[in-house]
Amino acid sequence: MIRAVVDSPQNEHTLAWLFLDLLVIEHRCAPGMDTVVLEMTLPVGSSPALHVHDSLDDTWYILDGEMVVRCGDDTLVVGAGYWVSMPRGVPHTFRVVGDQDARILLVHDNASFRDFIRALGVPAAAYVVPAQPVFPAMDELARVARAHDLTPIGPPMSADDADAILAATVH
């Protein structure tokens, strides 16, 4: 018999991780599916290094908050209700802006990013953003990232860059 997969915060199958300055909740999909869904809570100011995935389209739906996104030569301001899909091979980064944490659903067609989170994350005892970020040594972070199809190629987006993009954008 095929059964539906249902996760909830109280479900013993739901995995949650503290990763860098993020809370990551891993949602299960039906058996045999390659789809990976991660719910991430990102604090204001959170910004990953400019990076590229060679075999993963980085796709997310924004549930809460506002972000400035750089994908290739494009910059945009996005918020709740936006769907963002950045193609593999294109450098990208973002920064959470405003006065509210961002909450996004990542939807990926392979497990490389989820496995990156699992490799460096710390199991979360509660569904809250870590009070103290969990940052591994930068050389370890870069090594594990590259092993999971994430190649850092530049710095995170600075607050000044995000502010300049916000100032130039009518929203």
Residue ranges, per PLM feature:
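A short, N-terminal "cap"/entry segment at the start of jelly-roll beta-barrel domains
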Residues: 1-35, 128-171
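Short acidic-glycine-tyrosine-enriched beta hairpin
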Residues: 8, 13, 31, 66, ...
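Conserved hydrophobic/aromatic beta-strand scaffold that supports enzyme active sites
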Residues: 24, 37-39, 59, 75, ...
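Active-site region of the double-stranded beta-helix
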Residues: 24-35, 44-57
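Residue-level recognition of conserved beta-strand positions in structured domain cores
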Residues: 39, 52, 71-73, 80, ...
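A short beta-strand-loop-beta hairpin characteristic of the jelly-roll/cupin
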Residues: 47, 53-82
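Ligand-binding loop in jelly-roll beta-barrel domains
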Residues: 68, 88-114
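A hydrophobic, small-residue-rich beta->alpha segment in the mid-to-C-terminal subdomain
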Residues: 115-130
